[in-house]
Amino acid sequence: MKCMIVIPARLASSRLSQKLLLQAGGKSVLQHTYEAALKSSVAEEVIVAVDDPRLAAEVDSFGGQARLTSVDCQSGTDRIAEVALMHEDINILINVQGDEPEIDPKTIDAVAKLLMQHPEADIATAACAIKDRERVEDPNCVKAVLGDDHRAITFSRAAVPHPRDGLTDALLNAEPPNYWQHIGLYAYRREFLLWFATQPPGRLEQIEKLEQLRAIEAGKTIVVAPVEASAPGIDTLEDFRAFTARIESQ
């Protein structure tokens, strides 16, 4: 199977202006993400799907491949679907967010390989165990509920599964884990992705603001790769400063 990593990159950002172009350690955030993606052992190609010529110029400056996509794309998934239309020979497309410069290539590989191992699945993604009460209860920490054989039952911002009798230490520390933090990295089968991009947002998706629920509502199969930890993304100036400090300390 042929795999391609696509990094959807949008210039505008509500909380941190043009964050993908910010420099840390002599490289842009976008270049750091691109170079991390290149370390994947499963992808034959890495492409950045951009919405602005300035991002395309940045990708060109560090020798990467950029594809200019429509400004009308409503999400990164839509940008990846546009790239999928250009590459009929690709079987699996992997979505790596442009603002995750510390993404672990092993996580990328684990997600792609899991999709290959499950021909019945449409999407693969990742999650790490949660042992911290605050994260379980934090709506900004998206939880994945897992069934047998890596299947995702649902995703939610709520504390799910909900502990009727209270969240005890026994529930938090159980093995296998009861609580999983979803990691927003996806591998899609090309035919599924092209279908998905034509579908309107689902009812649950609109309530939770979680795009993956569109697939769950439609009865599609999502498999989840368990990984050790999630990579910190860059959403705020504080996130960027922390990333810069880590880069400069290396």
From Swiss-Prot:
Cell compartment(s), UniProt: Cytoplasm
GO-annotated cellular components: cytosol
UniProt KW Kinase keyword: no
Annotated GO biological process: CMP-keto-3-deoxy-D-manno-octulosonic acid biosynthetic process; lipopolysaccharide biosynthetic process
EC number of the protein: 2.7.7.38
Keyword Transferase in annotation: yes
MF (Gene Ontology): 3-deoxy-manno-octulosonate cytidylyltransferase activity
Classification via CDD domains: CMP-KDO-Synthetase
Keywords: Cytoplasm, Lipopolysaccharide biosynthesis, Nucleotidyltransferase, Transferase
Family label: Belongs to the KdsB family.
Name of the protein: 3-deoxy-manno-octulosonate cytidylyltransferase
Organism: Rhodopirellula baltica (strain DSM 10527 / NCIMB 13988 / SH1)
